[in-house]
């Protein structure tokens, strides 16, 4: 120890010895501070080289001579590598990473990768102090960075790619389902808003709902047939035709609704009345028909099918013949009734009941308000009372001349109507069927209350009648029901359906589908 200079600073000198030919090579192990490596806890440590990459650098061993050898194989392989610029790397054991296991299998595992280029521009030395106080300096040959190895299994490159694709698939599915939920929520909100608006505008929503809930009695279920789909398709097609005609009216209606919404605050009582009129006019086009046109009964109303429009002239002639036969049967008992009229006043009750059927045509033509004559006891009844209680059209012995004139007028009207029916085409004749039925006197006239009492019936729903229709041409159940209407048969709609079902079961006709409709027919 020596003091140099006058400044009074103390300087300590050490002797450092560097070996010329070191027998050992020293390497540096660098750990990351974040790993918190504590060497004092290491009881056991083992290091070995990781030679797993040896297969990558290993060449295929081919025999140089003998079987399987190739002439100048090495030279050709080298020329190929030079041509494509392929540089082979030699497998050096010193360059392979270290595997460090601490405290056996239960401990941690580290992997040390060699850091290249450390000794190119700088030199690192390791100093060790000897017993005499001098230091020996050994140069560092290699530098290794050690990182802890994860215990859990990691994915390879291919497995990672598959998992990435699966992740994208899951995320896409999640986004699609989220969009669907949002759309459903928006759709529900829109429906709620539309429902509230319909209830505000004169209860239109309720009316439309009722219209959709209303279903006509399904005839096919009772008849055990399979033509329900055809009927539904017909109804849908006809309902589609109706809005096509009303397209301009709907456009104008939307404009009116918009204007009404804009001026809701300044609305008066008259605005709602206008809306109701629009709705009523749009509800059904039948209200806009000509006032002079005769409307059929409820059973006859409804859309006319294609089969009804395409009825042949033979069918119309057959119906005409049936009507004439019925009229002749009605007119046959007239001479017997005339003999009964010549009897005394005691038989007024029988006269009124029997002659009421004969004079039904004349009474239906000239009198609107008519009631069926109530029966009275023979003892207490008198001429005046029976005449007063009977219908205005019932003849009595005193009114023989008037009844004959009424019959003549009725017969003339029937003949004139027959001439017009024969001249009119088949399509018009179907619509005008209601007129001749009332004038022929086969059904009692309807009073003002709207209730009609069914008579004996023009057409009887029998097996022979159904057989005749089915042998003529194939017909659907709708067509058969239109042939046997309640007005003609005198039966209710349920009774006609049940009777027709039983008749079809007995006949067991052949079936065929034409234009998605089940048709029944019988072979002669």
From Swiss-Prot:
Region of interest (Disordered), residue spans: 56-76, 181-462
Ranges of Polar residues composition bias in the record: 436-459
GO CC, any one term: transcription factor TFIIF complex
Compositional bias segments (type: Basic and acidic residues): 290-307
Record note on modification: Phosphorylated on Ser and other residues by TAF1 and casein kinase II-like kinases.
Organism: Xenopus laevis
The UniProt record lists the keyword Transferase: yes
Role: TFIIF is a general transcription initiation factor that binds to RNA polymerase II and helps to recruit it to the initiation complex in collaboration with TFIIB. It promotes transcription elongation.
Record's compositionally biased regions (Basic residues): 242-257, 368-378
InterPro entries tied to this protein: TFIIF-alpha (IPR008851), TFIIF_interaction (IPR011039), WH-like_DNA-bd_sf (IPR036388), WH_DNA-bd_sf (IPR036390)
Source organism superkingdom: Eukaryota
Acidic residues bias locations: 262-289, 308-327, 347-358
Alphabetical list of SUPFAM superfamilies matching this protein: Rap30/74 interaction domains, Winged helix' DNA-binding domain
Protein name, as recorded: General transcription factor IIF subunit 1
Keywords: DNA-binding, Nucleus, Phosphoprotein, Transcription, Transcription regulation, Transferase
Assembly: Heterodimer of an alpha and a beta subunit.
Similarity comment: family membership: Belongs to the TFIIF alpha subunit family.
GO biological process, one term: transcription initiation at RNA polymerase II promoter
GO molecular function: DNA binding; promoter-specific chromatin binding; RNA polymerase II general transcription initiation factor activity; TFIIF-class transcription factor complex binding; transferase activity
Compartments where found: Nucleus
Biased composition (Low complexity): 381-397
């Amino acid at each position: 120890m020596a003091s140099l200079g006058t400044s009074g600073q103390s300087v300590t000198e050490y002797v450092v010895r560097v070996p010329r030919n070191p027998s050992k090579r020293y390497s540096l192990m660098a750990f990351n501070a974040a790993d918190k490596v504590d060497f004092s806890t290491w009881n056991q440590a083992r290091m070995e080289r990781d030679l797993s990459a040896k297969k990558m650098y290993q060449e295929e061993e081919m025999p140089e001579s003998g079987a399987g050898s190739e002439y100048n194989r090495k030279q050709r392989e080298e020329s190929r590598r030079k041509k494509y610029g392929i540089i082979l790397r030699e497998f050096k054991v010193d360059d392979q990473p270290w595997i460090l296991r601490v405290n056996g299998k239960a401990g941690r595992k580290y992997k040390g990768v060699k850091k290249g280029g450390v000794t190119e521009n700088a030199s690192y030395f390791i100093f060790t102090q000897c017993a005499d106080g001098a230091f020996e300096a050994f140069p560092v040959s290699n530098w290794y960075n050690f990182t802890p190895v994860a215990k859990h299994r990691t994915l390879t490159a291919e497995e990672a790619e598959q998992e990435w694709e699966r992740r994208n698939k899951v995320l896409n599915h999640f986004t699609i389902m989220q969009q669907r939920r949002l759309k459903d929520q928006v759709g529900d909100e829109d429906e709620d808003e539309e429902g509230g608006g319909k209830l505000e505008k004169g209860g239109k929503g309720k009316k439309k709902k009722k219209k959709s809930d209303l279903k006509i009695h399904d005839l096919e279920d009772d008849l055990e047939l399979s033509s329900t789909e055809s009927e539904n398709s017909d109804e849908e097609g006809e309902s589609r035709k109706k809005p096509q005609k009303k397209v301009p009216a709907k456009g104008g209606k939307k404009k009116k609704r918009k204007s009404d919404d804009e001026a809701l605050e300044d609305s008066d009582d008259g605005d709602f009345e206008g809306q109701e009129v629009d709705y009523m006019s749009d509800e059904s086009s039948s209200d806009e028909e000509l006032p002079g046109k005769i409307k059929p009964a409820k059973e006859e109303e409804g859309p006319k099918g294609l089969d009804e429009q395409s009825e042949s002239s033979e069918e119309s002639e057959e119906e005409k013949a049936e009507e004439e036969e019925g009229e002749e049967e009605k007119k046959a008992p007239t001479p017997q009734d005339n003999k009964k009229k010549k009897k005394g006043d005691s038989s007024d009750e029988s006269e009124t009941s029997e002659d009421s059927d004969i004079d039904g045509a004349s009474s239906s033509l000239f009198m609107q308000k008519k009631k069926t004559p109530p029966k009275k006891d023979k003892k207490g009844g008198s001429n005046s009372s029976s005449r007063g209680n009977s219908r205005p059209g019932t003849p009595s012995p005193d009114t023989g001349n008037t009844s004959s004139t009424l019959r003549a007028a009725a017969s003339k009207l029937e003949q004139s109507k027959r001439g017009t029916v024969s001249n009119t085409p088949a399509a018009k004749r179907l619509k005008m069927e209601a007129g001749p039925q009332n004038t022929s006197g086969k059904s009692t006239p309807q009073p003002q209350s709207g209730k009609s009492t069914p008579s004996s019936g023009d057409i009887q729903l029998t097996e022979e009648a159904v057989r005749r229709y089915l042998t003529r041409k194939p017909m659907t159940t709708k067509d058969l029901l239109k042939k046997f209407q309640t007005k003609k048969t005198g039966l209710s709609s349920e009774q006609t359906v049940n009777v027709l079902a039983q008749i079809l079961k007995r006949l067991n006709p052949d079936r065929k589908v034409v234009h998605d409709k089940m048709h029944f027919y019988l072979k002669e």
